[in-house]
Regions:
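Transmembrane helical cores of multi-pass secondary ion antiporters/exchangers
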Residues: 1-445
Length: 446
């Protein structure tokens, strides 16, 4: 039986028991990372793939491109502006501080690493992925303002980090004397051409689709296909002219949302669904190739130390700093700081980096990112349900506090649901646990 056949069986088996696993805080990413590790080179070796395999790179890149476009087109800039400022603080102050702190510690922890490679590690691990801790943004016990801020942050920070990752990859390659010495100009060229592709595909394409829809020329199916095609065209078009496809996908999604004024959110879900399906495969590839690399090499302590710091100090201290003046409770600051899971964007960024820096820095980068994501998949996955319930219960007892300020309900993106079986099932369990008092206690069900 081939590796892909076995993987398909795993997918079917997971769908049959997903709700049961959900009750035990076992998430989709956990299942598929474990399956990949077992089936990959470090295990049964029935998935004959490598990190440089063209199929692997294509699948992961297109998955991120689809999710960047769909996220950016639905989590619009208006969402950032509509709150009291929490998403803006996290995105435009917290993200740069996180990268700065991560770069500094990487430079200190890894001997011989240059400033560009240190900054690259930090930028790769800066974006968050709400799918790994879905209970945090769906549990109604958590104040809507907090859920909304974390949801918007997760939806936009991978796209915002992409230009920095592009810049640092070019700088790190030049630092190792394997890249273009004019790395800054090359990176700026990629960013500029990506914006051109985004305008042409995202904005003009969105205007044309909205124009056709208003005149009744489209159908629901044709709109879904058109949006998928635009997402792929933004990515591939940018790559074809020498631009960065991910920047084009993200910027194209923003411009598409602006051009259509949010009136095509429902058809966008088709693109999200494809991204969700592909994300299961990406998590399996992460387990097979990234985790597989760890299983076949000697244990190194420094990457583990950095991984722990990345999930704690490097994330939590900047979040605490940018939330000064918001009058949020210390428990809220700690809650928001802890729930910054690292996921799919970091996987794809690492593959991109490894294509350019395959020398001394590549192994250290791979181990560091792998340990960080692996720990995040497990720790954020198992801690999200109980901590969300306990935090929500503690806030519910408080009076009129800033956490309870009015805010719009966050839109839960479909690919976030990869972390849990279904929102409907979760809500049903929340209702039951509230009635029995389990929600406040965070008791693990038997």
């Amino acid at each position: 039986m081939g590796g892909l056949t076995v993987l398909a069986v795993v997918v079917v088996a997971y769908t049959l028991v997903a709700s049961k696993l959900d009750r035990w805080w076992i998430t989709g990413p956990m299942v598929f990372v474990a399956a990949g590790a077992i089936l990959g080179p470090g295990g049964l070796d029935v998935l004959p793939l490598s990190l440089t395999n063209e199929t692997v790179v294509t699948i992961t890149e297109l998955t991120l491109a689809l999710l960047l476009f769909s996220d950016a087109s639905t989590v619009r800039l208006q969402d950032v502006e509509g709150d009291a400022g929490l998403p803006r603080r996290l995105l435009f102050a917290g993200l740069p501080l996180t990268i700065l702190a991560g770069a500094l510690l990487a430079y200190l922890i890894f001997p011989g690493v240059g400033w560009a490679a240190a900054a690259l590690i930090a930028a790769i691990l800066a974006p968050t992925d709400a799918a790994l801790g879905l209970a945090v943004v769906t549990n109604k016990a958590v104040p809507v303002r907090i859920r909304r801020a974390l949801n918007v942050e997760s939806g936009l920070n991978d796209g915002i980090a992409t230009p920095l990752v592009t810049l640092f990859i070019a700088a790190a390659a030049a630092e190792e004397s394997i890249g273009d010495k004019a790395w800054g100009l090359e990176a700026l060229k990629q960013i500029g051409l990506a914006i051109v592709a985004a305008v042409v595909v995202g904005y003009i394409g969105g205007k044309l689709l909205a124009f056709a829809r208003e005149r009744g020329w489209t159908s629901g199916v044709s709109e879904q296909i058109a949006i998928l095609a635009l997402a792929l065209l933004a990515y591939e078009g940018a790559v074809a002219i020498g631009g960065n496809g991910f920047i084009a996908g993200f910027a194209g999604g923003i411009l598409f949302g602006a051009a259509t004024r949010g009136r095509l959110e429902e058809p966008v879900q088709f693109t999200e669904t494809l991204g969700l399906s592909a994300s299961f495969l990406v998590w399996s590839l992460f387990g097979a190739l990234f985790v597989g690399e760890l299983l076949t090499h000697d244990l190194s302590v420094r990457p583990i130390v950095y991984a722990v710091l990345s999930l704690t100090v490097i994330r939590m201290v900047p979040v605490a700093l940018v939330l000064i003046g918001t009058h949020l409770r210390p428990a809220t600051v700690a809650f928001m700081g802890w729930f910054g899971p690292r996921g799919l964007a970091s996987v794809v960024f690492t593959l991109l980096a490894l294509q350019e820096i395959e020398h001394s820095g590549g192994g250290m980068l791979l181990q560091t990112v792998t340990w960080t994501i692996l720990l995040s998949v497990v720790l954020h996955g198992i801690s999200a349900p109980p901590l969300a319930a306990r935090y929500g219960a503690s806030i519910a007892k408080a009076g009129n506090i800033p956490e309870k300020a009015p805010a719009g309900e966050p839109r839960v993106r479909l690919h976030d649901l990869a972390g849990r079986h279904s929102l409907r099932g979760q809500q049903a369990r929340e209702t039951t646990s509230t009635a029995t008092g389990e929600s406040a206690a965070g008791t693990r069900p038997s």
